[in-house]
Amino acid sequence: MSNAPTALTLAGWQQAYRDGQSPAELLHALRLKLRTDDSAWIALASEAQLDAQLDALASALQEAAGDLSKLPLYGVPFAIKDNIDAAGWPTTAACPEFAYGAETDASVVARLRAAGAILIGKTNLDQFATGLVGTRSPYGAVPNSFNLDYVSGGSSSGSASVVARGLVPFSLGTDTAGSGRVPAGFNNIVGLKPTKGWLPNTGLVPACRSIDCISVFALTVADALTVANIAGGYDAADAYSRKNPNSAKVGMPTKPRLAVPANPEFFGDSQNQTVYEAALGKLRELGAELVEIDFAPFRQLAEQLYYGPWVAERTVAVEGVDPAHINPVVRGIVENGHRYSACDAYKAEYIRAELSRRINDALTGFDALVVPTSPTIRTLAEMQAEPVLFNSQFGTYTNFTNLADLCALAVPAGLRADGLPAGITLIAPAWHDQALAAFGQRWQQALNLPLGATGKPLPVQITSDKPAQGCIRVAVVGAHLTGMPLNFQLSTRDAVLVEQTTSAAHYRLFALPGTVPPKPGLARVAEDGAEIIVELWDVPQARFGEFVAEIPPPLGIGNLELADGRWVKGFICEPYALDGARDITSFGGWRAFIAETRK
């Protein structure tokens, strides 16, 4: 990576900067590479906007005393869907007459910029985020990144497209009905649909305000999770923001128990069905137990989103907009909101509550539900002929998710016979985002598909039970985690991140007082233990002694048991240091605790 930006992942950009490249050089080259006639973009950063961000980045690095670990997204370009505010940029929601100049960043954008990320552009969408197709915009339809005759999926069409083509390593979308998942499936990328309220919606143009989610697109699950962990967290300015109770599992068993729909519907699309069935076979190869469940309550709840009073939320969101300026298909949808009464809304809420209870009961005893991301895909011409029917088909396996308060992770599953991608989605109850991502990383490595539409291979990630040759596998739990202050002690010694997983349920985590930077102590206990999030790193044997020599008391290296029964080297703590230390086990890991203390 010398003259033009070609890195596709966060690690690629970070490595470029470690190799001596400058953000100014790489990001100005990227800006010149991007085309204004690309329908995925609504606005691109001007030279002045980019320079202002680069100046702010230089100041942030100076404040960090040159420590890049304090800016985990240092110099990484990203894009946001143009219904999300960025200070100094217009927000259009794909409706020029609605547009306004944003005076402040949306909360998620502010957090990403504070971590060093650089906003390079705002992306196209189905107008007012109403649609799963990517064709309902006055800025043009966004075509599929694999075949220009097909839809890209929506409503976060542009955000998915620019990631799939490797223009940015990550982007933000939104997901109310599936807008952060369907485009991921259609473009061979990852779409992380977080638990409602994890990523705050402050600065988001609402679609259905009570169930809207800001989502993340990336080429890898690891990158999507990193971005979500930075952007997420409670925001008092958002009435729908929630604090993570830290009660959900953060890992998944080696042999998970997964629910799958009985008699899944593909609307005659045998190619999508073939990819899905092959994916189920691969899950079995990975040790998963698959159990069919009745999908009727999921389907019934999905129907409520567009064929019930929830459509009135969309009506409220655009009530100040002249109907003449709204896309005809979108206008037809939002005008339906006037058909429903307050009585209808309460009746629908009772139905939602009953079906949600049935859905969550059905998922009890399972680690996740696995569904096709979309049952089918359509051409642009087909979508023009049947815009509502085919949109409804795309939402078969997505529309129920937010109404039932579930989280989801869309991941690539393979290519169809015609060369188009298809995906699967992992779904679980609220706050199981980390567990889904843990298995999603394992799944992505097992399939080893090319990244998006770039044709480039997935970066090698060591996933075997044994460390790489000449390395010692070490579990880190605190300040050495990715993006934390002491992570450089691993990265500068050529250590390689293997995976995120959890300890066995025999440990408790404590915040050690007076440590700089703040550090936790992990202690094995005889009872009342819990699983704690850890990262596994393979450290070269030749550098292991140097690494251990930098570990101050009361910490040291010992043996640590993982949730799947493996034993690795890991951080331990002298018992004397735990006297009076705060027990933070309920947070599930050090990163969640640190995020809470910063609020």
Q: Model-found features: residue ranges?
A:
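Gly/Ser-rich, acidic/histidine-flanked active-site/gating loops
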Residues: P5, T9, G75, A87, ...
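Short Gly/aromatic-enriched secondary-structure transition segments
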Residues: A43, A93-A94, L486-S503
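Short glycine/serine-rich loop segments
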Residues: D105-A231, N402-T425
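An N-terminal boundary/leader segment
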Residues: M1-D55, E285-G287, G452-L458
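Glycine-rich, small-residue loops and helix-cap segments
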Residues: L30, G75, A114, V168-P169, ...
